[in-house]
């Protein structure tokens, strides 16, 4: 270990949507560095309990699970207060939870709009607002998970695209609002994990063919980038880090 590298031992992170997929990989990575975790989940209770048991096997009493609906503003403040009540501080907020599904123009409902905006943009804002106080005390940071589709819109997903573009704007705005005590950055994944459900293999291969590295990434690529932003990037704020195999540079 680099002697000059900041230790994350006993630091505390809240990770939304941390029970599965990329969120779980981020949780494992930060926990491996000695952090205590508050893992939020909504409908993935079984996966959350399995992950907690796995992490507690390595370090007992280091993970708190909080199941809640991010569409309920009152519960967002409670999520932060539960973290500080359990572990006494908050050092990192990872806004990872996200809803993703098509909303073709002409077929989008009010409910879909409210759900996507609520989970992908409103919740990160109000969680960040609730966390700003303890993060200011600890000199901590916020990491938002955005998407390369924020700037390269995905067809038939206009509302999702808008939410991620908004989250990029929020990342930069919060960096100005909360600095110098709190750093705020974002990670924009490319093709890492395909969405749950039906998979269009032709579309997958088309995307990979337009990626300079000619392959997909994996959740560890995202988790290691989050770790870098948390631990090593002390002079970085308001930045969006694309982890996409170069897809964002290809027309």
Please place each PLM-identified region on the residue numbering:
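Short, small/polar-rich loop/turn modules that mediate ligand/substrate recognition or access, typified
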Residues: 179-183, 237-238
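A conserved structural motif in NAD(P)-dependent oxidoreductases
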Residues: 211-222
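Short C-terminal tail/terminal secondary-structure segment
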Residues: 2-5, 152, 227, 231-251
